[in-house]
């Protein structure tokens, strides 16, 4: 089991935890349909960056 060599000061502990907070997901709006989706993911209608890339289930 790992054992620390030296005690981490409260300041260093705070710096270590500085990026542990949650961030809201970055959302994008599809220009053709106007739907909101996660960035770098296709929209529910199968569009990505204005082009139809996947057929939707109902098509």
From Swiss-Prot:
Q: Which GO terms describe its biological process?
A: translation
Instruction: Extract the ranges annotated as region (Disordered).
Output: 1-25
Q: Does the keyword Ribosomal protein apply?
A: yes
Query: What start-end ranges are recorded for coiled-coil regions in this protein?
Result: none
Keywords, comma-separated and alphabetical: Ribonucleoprotein, Ribosomal protein
- Domain of life here? Bacteria
The Swiss-Prot or TrEMBL record annotates one GO molecular function as: structural constituent of ribosome
State the GO CC annotations.
Answer: large ribosomal subunit
Would the keyword Magnesium be found if you checked this record's keyword annotation?
no
HAMAP family in the record = Ribosomal_bL32 (MF_00340)
Q: Which family does it belong to?
A: Belongs to the bacterial ribosomal protein bL32 family.
The name on file for this protein is Large ribosomal subunit protein bL32
- Origin species, per record, is Azoarcus sp. (strain BH72)
